[in-house]
């Protein structure tokens, strides 16, 4: 499970349809990471984790964004 409380979102990048999103975020210990989220139009409860997330820690937002773009097919840098 992803802990959404202990992070500062640096960027939230949505697809054109607004149904998928990648968050680039910094944790309390300074780690920069990314994870992918989705929402379903028939489910009003909001965003849900897809389970796709960074396998490494990045030094900055730009590095995390570039790494996410290599993994997430709809994401463009």
Residue ranges with predicted function:
Residues 5, 17-18, 25, 37-38, ...:
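Intrinsically disordered, low-complexity regions of eukaryotic proteins
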Residues 6-11, 31, 51, 73:
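Intrinsic-disorder/low-complexity peptide segments enriched for small residues
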Residues 16-19, 30, 59, 64:
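A generic structural micro-environment signature
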């Amino acid at each position: 499970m992803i802990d959404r409380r202990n992070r500062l979102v640096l960027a939230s990048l949505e697809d054109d349809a607004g149904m998928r999103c990648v968050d680039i975020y910094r944790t309390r210990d300074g780690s920069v990471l990314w994870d992918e989220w989705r929402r379903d139009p028939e489910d009003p409860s909001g965003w849900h984790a897809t389970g796709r997330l960074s396998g490494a820690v990045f030094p900055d937002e730009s590095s995390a964004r570039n790494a996410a773009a290599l993994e997430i097919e709809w994401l463009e840098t």
